[in-house]
């Protein structure tokens, strides 16, 4: 079973940059998208063989997630927790027979960490939500999680020490999640792989120089790890400032 997660940075723009051709070649069972920036009624394209689920922000052209899945889920829910988390279209949960899939676009802490307090509340509430799901069946949690967990996960850790996405507070929240029974699949399989990034700034020729960050993840319940065949990053796929990340599971 192949699952793909990709922050497309605006799906309408990505559609003009080869998105449908990518989907055909990727042959994924599940495609999770973040930052779609569109509503379902704007999706004027065909993706044969997939059930499509959308969660759009109240604010037009902002945030948003989608899940395209060949296997019809048992149930699909949108957002989680308190009302404060229910206006930006950031989470879709699909329940399958043997696991929950959670597609997430984590809020950015913003310049000068202006939104850090909200981010911390989000992380605590989402971790509680994931643990509630995990008590029922294993969880596959994926998306743009807006944090580089370790120094190996970005090109320039020292100069980004207190920037959004690499603050001590954000990294500590990821550590807490991984200490509560979840596994970062890519880093578990490739603990020493350097230069493996999923996002690059649009400035300073960052992508050409591979001056990137690994902020897109597949994180799974620890007991699901025996089913993990591979977890990878596909930096050769363009169309967004992020690239897709992939998880392959045995059936």
Which positions does each model-derived feature cover?
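Metal-dependent phosphoesterases centered on the DNase I-like endonuclease/exonuclease/phosphatase
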Residues: 30, 51, 122-211, 215
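Structured beta-strand-rich core segments of catalytic domains in phosphoester-bond hydrolases
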Residues: 37, 43-109
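Active-site beta-strand termini and strand-to-loop segments that position acidic
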Residues: 70, 94-97, 221-222, 247-251
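Conserved beta strand-loop-helix elements of the APE1-like EEP
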Residues: 60-75, 203-226
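N-terminal, active-site-proximal structural segment of metallo-dependent hydrolase catalytic domains
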Residues: 1-47, 57-63, 78
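Active-site-proximal beta-strand elements of phosphoester/diester hydrolases
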Residues: 1-9, 98-110, 142
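Surface-exposed cleft-lining segments at the edges of enzyme active sites
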Residues: 81-82, 107-123, 158-162
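Active-site beta-strand/loop signature of hydrolases that rely on acidic residues for catalysis
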Residues: 7, 23-41, 101, 130-151, ...
């Amino acid at each position: 079973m192949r699952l793909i997660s990709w922050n497309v940075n605006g799906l309408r723009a990505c559609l003009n940059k080869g998105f449908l051709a990518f989907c055909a070649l990727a042959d994924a069972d599940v495609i999770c998208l973040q930052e779609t920036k569109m509503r379902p009624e704007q999706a004027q394209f065909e993706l044969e063989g997939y059930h499509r689920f959308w969660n759009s922000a109240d604010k037009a052209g902002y945030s948003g997630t989608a899940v395209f899945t060949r296997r019809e889920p048992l149930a699909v829910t949108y957002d989680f927790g308190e009302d404060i988390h229910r206006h930006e279209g950031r989470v879709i949960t699909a329940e399958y027979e043997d696991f929950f899939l959670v597609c997430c676009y984590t809020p950015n802490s913003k310049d000068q960490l202006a939104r850090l307090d909200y981010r911390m509340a989000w992380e605590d509430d989402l971790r509680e939500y994931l643990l509630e799901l995990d008590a029922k069946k294993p969880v596959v949690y994926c998306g743009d999680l807006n944090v580089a967990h370790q120094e190996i996960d970005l090109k320039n850790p020292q100069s980004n020490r207190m920037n959004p996405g690499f603050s001590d507070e954000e990294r500590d929240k990821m550590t807490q999640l991984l200490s509560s029974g979840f596994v970062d699949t890519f880093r578990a399989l490739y603990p020493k792989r350097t230069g493996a990034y999923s996002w690059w700034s649009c400035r300073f020729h960052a992508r050409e120089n591979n001056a990137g960050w690994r902020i897109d993840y597949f994180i799974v319940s620890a007991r699901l790890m025996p089913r993990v065949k591979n977890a990878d990053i596909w930096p050769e796929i363009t169309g967004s400032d992020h690239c897709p990340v992939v998880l392959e599971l045995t059936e």
